[in-house]
Amino acid sequence: LAVFDTAGEVVCAKKRFLPVKEGQLGLRQSDALFHHTVALPEMLAELGSEFDLTQISAVGVSEKPRPVEGSYMPCFLAGVSAAEAFALARGIPLVRTTHQQGHAAAALFAAKGEELFREKTLLFHISGGTTDLLLCDEVKHIETLGTSSDLYAGQAVDRVGVKLGFGFPAGVEVSRLAAECDETIKPRSSVRGMECSLSGLENQCNALLTAGKSPAYVCKYCLLCVADTVVKMTKAAQKEYPGFAVVCAGGVMSSDIIRSWVQQRLPQVYFVPGRYSSDNAIGVSILAAREAGLWLK
């Protein structure tokens, strides 16, 4: 949950991880829907303790993963239900958007404020459920230019982490352990144009562990392979879209190791703070303000 004001400032934001049993790689949709339903009233109360909710002028909600036909996940129903109830009770507009557009809005805002909302931008959205290179047109229209043909980057990172005994999601722990490795590593990535394949990454990491490489080495190798994939896909995109700003978002892109590798090779690429890069409601609140005519008029 987040509050964004008409002055273009994030007033407050709340988030919490849903509980995942040890050794598992996520939640079933029925369990995710249940936990969302339980958490939302509690988090709304927390938000209300920091901000006067009677001052809210519009409500935004992500109703599905992506702005394409057929995109659907049951757990989004919890947020839609809560948002509809709040908006109806207050008699204020309800703005429906998507998880992907929320990520895009938060990342573009963190990168350059309102500037990137007025132009076309290249955006990497890399998380547990996406490895997408997107062409964003004011976040109103999003076109997928490239993606993974199999495993997503976040899945690869989480699988390595869970195999090493970390809880899900494992990205933070994988990054922490990777930082302990000072060996020089040459990653191997599979990229063709703006498309990539990451299924081999999991196998490579398992083989390295079997060969006796340290967990820290394997974690660093995994993250650098993701980083190298980003570099190659970005270079391919820049050939077709020269001069476009490039912004990286998604939980995986919060890694300092990935950021350092990419920016050493592509210093013009924008990475945004973890607060705006990982899953959050900030982008959705920004889009609600814009679509309701309260910001970026």
Task: For the regions a language model picked out, list residue spans one by one.
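Short glycine-rich, Thr/Ser-proximal phosphate-binding strand/loop in the N-terminal lobe
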Residues: 1-34, 141-144
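A short helix-loop
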Residues: 2-4, 11-13, 115-119, 124-126, ...
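Short, well-ordered amphipathic alpha-helical segments that serve as non-catalytic structural scaffolds
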Residues: 14-17, 35-50, 229-234
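Short beta-strand-loop/turn "lid" adjacent to the catalytic site in phosphate-handling enzymes
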Residues: 45-81
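Glycine-rich beta-strand-to-loop/alpha-helix junction loops that act as flexible
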Residues: 61-64, 127-129, 247-255
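Conserved phosphate-binding catalytic cores of ATP/NTP-utilizing and phosphoryl-transfer enzymes
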Residues: 92, 96-121, 286-287
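Glycine-rich phosphate-binding/hydrolytic loop that grips phosphoryl groups
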Residues: 103-107, 272-297
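A contiguous, well-structured pocket-lining segment that forms one wall/lid of small-molecule binding clefts
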Residues: 175-246, 252-271, 289-297
